[in-house]
């Protein structure tokens, strides 16, 4: 029973046909192509999801089977217990029945769950089988598509390979054709551009030189005018300084007079105090006298008769004393009025001097402002003059370089014209030779016809021909000996070329030694200039330290000595003069430094020109050496090829006509380019700043000309080969027509000798050109090194000049600080003038108080006179 419960029909799922389909998947995947990997990955993902669902269903089935097994175990245990408890009571029977009923329910539930699980497993199995069938069908379709795609891909690959081969061949042909076309176009365009650029550059440089000369003359005139104005301003400054000194002397005289007046005023005040004390004493004595008089009035009546004479005498003494006092008072008043007049005169003189001092201070400030403005203008003018000098030097250097380039370009143009004329002459010579060869060909054809007509006669003369053949064999041996001689000459030429190379290397070593010596000299000059600059810098530092100490001492004196302000101001003016002189000295030293810098720049320009010339020579030497090596290799190749080349006379004629047409087309294009170059000769404005680029282009053009000469050499060699071919054909024609071809052979031999002489001349010129190119290449390298060293020296000199300018600016700033100190001193002078005015105001107040005292004194004197008169009148009445 348990065995039947444990066995489930779902176990057959593991042996379903879908698993066989899964087992066939790797083989199917192995035959897949790369194009179907995306669809296969999607199918694999779906299969993986289905497998995960299947695993979850398996786990659920196993769990249900475990629960069923547990329930079956419980059922077995319950049945055992039931069998053990059959002999128990009815209650146990009822309980057993209940348990059996529960077991029946559990069995039903278990069977229902099994049925549901089996249904679900069947549904899942069907779904899985359907999905697997769909996937297998899709995989088969994909395999079919993949096979079709593979076949199509192989076919397309074959087609692509064929097409790429065809395209490569077409591209090679096209590239070769484009190279040939571009080469010819580049030659014509570069020659025309070179001619027009050089002509435009020459015209522009001439115009620019004229314009710069005019600007230089204008600037020199302006500099002269500015110098005249500066001299006038310095003269005005000197006059203002003299006026200021005179005003200061007047101010000092006024100060001395004022101090004397103050002393006199003090003395007058002392005298006034003494007069006041005397007046007080007299008033006290008067009060006592009045008191005594009041006391004596009581006794007058008693002593009237007795003292009449005495009273009269006393009255006369009082009158005398009053008269004396009035006289003294009048004298004092006259002295006070004289002093007041002097004080008013001094005040007027003081106000006049003060106004003059203020005017002079204003004039001094204006003069200082104008001096500062003129100094700034002078600095700006000096800067502009220096900039213009630098610009003029640069332009002169550029002008010289452009002139040199123009001369070189004109020489190159002349060479090109000569080459062109030579090419025209060669063309004409080739045309004449072509005509001669055509005539020779016609004659050879006629001779061949004659030979055909006389063929039967030649058969009779076979024996004679055999002898002539032997003679021709001997001639062939002689030609072989001549060929060996030519090979020996070629070997000797190679040996001479090797010797020339050794000589060029030796000269290059000598030039390098000269360059090293020049570099050492330049280094010594740089060291000397740096030492001079260091000395100048040390002197300037010492001068600045001395001026700093001096300024500090002057500041301390100005702070400590307020009373001696005028003397300090005079000393400050003297120091300003000294500083201006020192500034002039510094400016002179700066001008010397600038002159040295200018000399260095001139040396730099000269060295740069040398570098450019040497670099050009070095480049030419290099190109000549390369051309010599290539010519040697080409000569070897041509020597090897010349031994086995045979062509027809008709092909030679066709080649010559083609060359003639080609030369005519090139001549027409060159003539058109030359016309365009003459038309566009005046249309370039920006060639002055591209001197080095023009030099590089000139070198490239030189390379191109060398390539052109190489092409001409190749053409010449081809013509020589054609001549050799003509010789071979002439020999054949001689074999065919012995009698008619001797004249043609003689003509061709003369032509061969002419061509050999031309070849020797051309090789000699080629060797000379190579030697010149090597020299120019070596010279270019040496000059390039000199240019680099001179550029470094220029940078160092520029740095030192910048440092000197910074130091000069620092000294100017210190001079401005000294001027600010003088302005502070002037402000102190004005403050003291204000204090002096306040003191004068106080003196005016004292004078006004003195007037009040005088008025009171007069009023008191008049009152005393009136009182004495009334008393006398009373005494007379009493009498």
Swiss-Prot record:
InterPro entries: Myosin_tail, XRCC4-like_C. One of its GO terms (cellular component) is myosin complex. Residues 837-879 are annotated as: Disordered. Keywords: Coiled coil, Cytoplasm, Motor protein, Muscle protein, Myosin, Thick filament. The keyword Cytoplasm applies. Residues 1-36, 861-879 are annotated as: Nonhelical region. Its main location: cytoplasm. Residues 860-869 have a biased composition (Polar residues). Residues 37-860 form a coiled coil. It is found in: Cytoplasm, Myofibril. Belongs to the paramyosin family. Paramyosin is a major structural component of many thick filaments isolated from invertebrate muscles. Homodimer. This is Paramyosin.
